[in-house]
A protein has these predicted regions:
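Conserved, mostly hydrophobic/aromatic
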Residues: 14, 31, 83, 124, ...
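Structural motif
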Residues: 34, 86, 107, 127, ...
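Short acidic/polar active-site loop segments enriched in Thr and Asp
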Residues: 37, 89, 130, 177
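Short helix-capping segments at alpha-helix termini
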Residues: 34, 61-67, 152-154
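Active-site mouth loops of central-metabolism enzymes
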Residues: 7-23, 67-72, 109-114, 155-158, ...
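Active-site-adjacent beta->alpha loops and helix N-cap segments on the catalytic face
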Residues: 2-3, 20-23, 43-61, 77-81, ...
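Catalytic domains of carbohydrate-active enzymes, especially glycoside hydrolases
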Residues: 29-39
Length: 212
């Protein structure tokens, strides 16, 4: 199974922002038990890019045979190259940057950039994107997603940001092929309190909402 197929298997990408070392490993382990098969480790703008790369390498080494590991919030060529060197299998950005998209494909990685308008979505695909994140989906809403999706049925469109247990099924029915979910899965309060088992149950709840 190739990287994109792994991601699309159930469509959920769990997004880790600001978790490292033991907390990250424990959280990912439980989310995998809950059925999650794709993880995104985000670069923190103004943060330590090397630390993000180390987290990607750590996850790839421990869980690479079970799931797809990617890098998120990739905004610069140096971050792209660092993510590739760290072992990232796919690259996610919040924006439509033709240079990043083309650079990602030149490295043989899956490209999933962010976009908000039909023009941006088509521009991303024309540049080589394998799929596109509609971002921020929660703020834009289900009706907006449907309206954008209707004239672009052949494009793989993810719903990212603001996706939760209350609306994920609606986005699925609206035509989303996948979902980027951060704090609802990487719940900071539960992780800080060491309640990692709860993450497994939350993951299962999300999958149940979309028929898994």
């Amino acid at each position: 199974m190739n990287t994109l197929d792994k991601i699309l298997d159930n469509g959920i990408i769990a997004i880790s922002r600001g978790f490292y070392e033991e907390k990250l490993m424990k959280a990912v382990s439980k989310l995998i038990k809950g059925g999650i098969k794709a993880f995104e480790v985000t670069f923190e703008q103004g943060g330590d890019d090397l630390r993000t790369a180390e987290a990607i390498t750590m996850l790839k080494s421990a869980f690479g045979n079970e799931c797809a590991i990617g890098a998120g919030t990739v905004l610069t060529k140096s971050q792209l190259e660092l993510a590739h060197s760290a072992g990232a299998e796919y690259i996610i950005s919040p924006n439509t940057d033709i240079g990043i998209i083309r650079g990602t494909k030149e490295l043989g990685l899956v490209s999933i950039p962010g976009a908000m308008t039909p023009t941006e979505i088509v521009t991303a695909v024309d540049a080589g994107a394998d799929a596109v994140n509609l971002f921020p989906a929660g703020s834009l809403g289900i009706d907006y997603f449907k309206a954008v999706r209707a004239p672009l049925p052949g494009i793989k469109l993810f719903a990212v940001a603001g996706v939760n247990l209350s609306n994920i099924a609606d986005f699925k029915r609206a035509g989303a092929c996948g979902f980027g979910i951060s704090s609802s899965l990487f719940n900071r309060k539960l992780i800080d309190e060491g309640k990692f088992d709860d993450l497994e149950y939350i993951a299962r709840a999300f999958l149940e909402q979309i028929g898994f």
